[in-house]
């Protein structure tokens, strides 16, 4: 099962991909993870990627395509994979066609208001990286990490202005992919509003294994 998870930031793509990867035994390939690896190496390229992500904009097609192609060439993708966060543009989708055959494109259906509510409430520990949410996963003590007592912070790309910019970018550049893959009869719509357990159950009904 070679599939793409398509949807705005905050739609729950990463959460569902983790569960599907575990259940179906196929790798979850996130461009976010690929970017973070580049940033961690602190190369000139990694620093450029960090600056772009922090601003809420998108990394260039050429860089993203090269990172994804390299990952898809590994042996663990032979039985299938989940692409999360790629492609984001028609140009990337065209490039992907030259690399691998896609079986299904899962479209996460969710409103912008719900995305803003989810993302603006996220908090991350500045020390250990554990994630919380002011509404859904509250820390025991406001502003303090349950695990290490570190200070909780808002990531630059979780600030409302950055979220709105990311959503605008998504609607302008990525949403056209829905039409692109609809014409290829690959789109499968999933309601991304319910809790993650219900979204997973819906996925398993559509893709029994």
Swiss-Prot record:
Molecular functions per Gene Ontology: adenylate kinase activity; ATP binding; zinc ion binding
Q: Name one Pfam family in it.
A: ADK
Q: Which GO terms describe its cellular component?
A: cytoplasm
Q: Name where it's found.
A: Cytoplasm
Q: Which family does it belong to?
A: Belongs to the adenylate kinase family.
What the protein does?
Catalyzes the reversible transfer of the terminal phosphate group between ATP and AMP. Plays an important role in cellular energy homeostasis and in adenine nucleotide metabolism.
Protein name as annotated: Adenylate kinase
Q: Which organism is it from?
A: Treponema denticola (strain ATCC 35405 / DSM 14222 / CIP 103919 / JCM 8153 / KCTC 15104)
Chain's gene name: adk
């Amino acid at each position: 099962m070679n599939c793409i998870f398509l949807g705005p930031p905050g739609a729950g793509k990463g959460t569902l991909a983790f569960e599907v990867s575990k259940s179906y035994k196929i790798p979850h390939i996130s461009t976010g993870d690929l970017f973070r690896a580049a940033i961690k190496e602190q190369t000139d390229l990694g620093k450029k990627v960090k600056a772009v992500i922090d601003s809420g904009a998108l990394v260039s097609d050429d860089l993203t395509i090269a990172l994804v192609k390299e990952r898809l060439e590994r042996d663990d993708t032979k039985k299938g994979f989940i692409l999360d966060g790629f492609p984001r543009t028609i140009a990337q989708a065209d490039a992907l066609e030259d690399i691998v055959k896609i079986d299904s494109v899962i479209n996460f259906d969710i409103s912008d208001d719900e995305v803003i509510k989810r993302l603006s409430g996220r908090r991350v520990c500045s020390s250990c990286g554990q994630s919380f949410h002011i509404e859904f996963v509250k820390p025991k003590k406001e502003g303090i990490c349950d695990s290490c007592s570190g200070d909780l912070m808002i990531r630059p790309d979780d600030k409302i202005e950055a979220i709105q910019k990311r959503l605008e970018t998504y609607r302008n550049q990525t949403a056209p992919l829905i039409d692109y893959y609809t014409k290829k009869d690959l789109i499968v719509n999933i309601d991304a509003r319910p809790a993650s357990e219900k979204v997973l159950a819906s996925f398993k009904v559509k893709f029994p294994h």
